[in-house]
């Protein structure tokens, strides 16, 4: 039995030729709601409430309602006698704030999502119904056809459609996912390899402590990550499948990228061949450019942020700091450290062999086992203007990529020292300490074009490469076709036993692997103790998301051919 709203939707969806959207994603032109005086003429399809017959149901096909008229509602004169004489205090300030602008955008997308998805569902349902009816019609014409059985099949189909409709109305929940194993740990929560029970989708489920995020005012970073993940379908960025929340936690279910991160690859290989390094840095630039195209700067790029997919290609993840600013606590900690090292005495910087620098770098990482996972962070890849809290632009990401290219080829970062303090000091005096590495026989470890690229990336902002087009024109990339990178065979392809193989990630049942996260666990315990368990967490507006393929009963007809994703949130 169709509800009244479903009948009206069917009527309106009879022919979609008049549905159009203007450049702002709102109904316009001669679209859904034309601006003209017309007379109401709504025809009810005959027999819509009749009992279904598998031979020839009277309600199908539906009457063509493409020219259905809709009353234009006349607006009575408004009484403005009680209207406020002036706007509330700080109205413009609040109206133009980032928070308000985001809520406005989310609201717009909600209504666009609502109507597009409604029509998409109705069209898909009609197609399914037509196929079932054609099948039953054929069966009814066969000799010895069983009318009772055909009626039962029709009733069974209607029941399935009813179940599909029910599932569409359900919100995603934690219990919808089966946890397989833990694959990550952060300061605010954990990441699990999980499977959605009904769709069997495998995903990486990030679970964040909601009260802790509110307590530390870190919700902005989570919302930024959610917005970035839902804004693009770029093959270079990790995709979001679901986002939802409950009283205790925020959940981000992302596509699972099974090949581990680029850091693991560097650890296993020590350093890369020049051709392999060129391939990976090319893909990293494509991934970072995809983020820049969305208007975001990552600001905290490091090898751990680049994941390797099942085919061996790069995907960028972890966009929490792309919100616009890095947390004051982190910046202040680094600024204080930079100031302190000015008063410390370090041995004069002398040229060391590649092997000595590599050994020193690895010893530092082993000695300070939480070096890479520190909540404060290391200065190895971060541009100096970011650490100093100065004004910066998107090219700080190019600095980070220059440091990663350097490390990929020789096995240590350009400013690494025997201690973290010495690393800070080297970074502070980067113009003196950035040296072209030499082999034991005196030959340069980098080719001229490699060194030319690195010094155009690790440079003062005014001398740094200014765009992706400038990057592609560098002689270092002369042999790279950026448009066909993902069709090339990568240097490394993960060997996976199944879609749930997590062998390239840390084993959270191993004490040795757990030792890497000592600082993270210690800080997390300290922060958790600050949270009042009795406090009621607020809801994040516009956080919930469900990707289109995960929506029951839709075919995506209205979205085929779109270059970008549908960044639709659900307002609950």
From Swiss-Prot:
Note, other: Present with 3500 molecules/cell in log phase SD medium.
Organism of provenance: Saccharomyces cerevisiae (strain ATCC 204508 / S288c) (Baker's yeast)
Record carries keyword Nucleotide-binding: yes
Matching Pfam families: Pkinase, Pkinase_C
Catalyzed chemical reaction(s): L-seryl-[protein] + ATP = O-phospho-L-seryl-[protein] + ADP + H(+); L-threonyl-[protein] + ATP = O-phospho-L-threonyl-[protein] + ADP + H(+)
Disulfide-bonded cysteines: none
Protein induction: Periodically expressed in the cell cycle, with a peak before the onset of budding.
Residue positions of the active site: 300 (proton acceptor)
GO CC annotation: cellular bud neck; nucleus; Sid2-Mob1 complex; spindle pole body
Domain AGC-kinase C-terminal: 478-555
Gene encoding the protein: DBF2
Residues covered by the Protein kinase domain: 177-477
Name under which the protein is recorded: Cell cycle protein kinase DBF2
Keywords: ATP-binding, Cell cycle, Cytoplasm, Cytoskeleton, Kinase, Nucleotide-binding, Nucleus, Phosphoprotein, RNA-binding, Serine/threonine-protein kinase, Transferase
One function term, GO molecular function aspect: protein serine kinase activity
Residue list for modification Phosphothreonine: 544
InterPro entries in the cross-refs: AGC-kinase_C, Kinase-like_dom_sf, Pkinase_C, Prot_kinase_dom, Protein_kinase_ATP_BS, Ser/Thr_kinase_AS, Ser_Thr_kinase_AGC
Signal sequence residues: none
Regulation of this protein's activity per its record: Kinase activity is regulated by BUB2, CDC15 and CDC5, and is maximal during nuclear division. CDK1 kinase inhibits cellular DBF2-MOB1 kinase activity via phosphorylation of both CDC15 and MOB1.
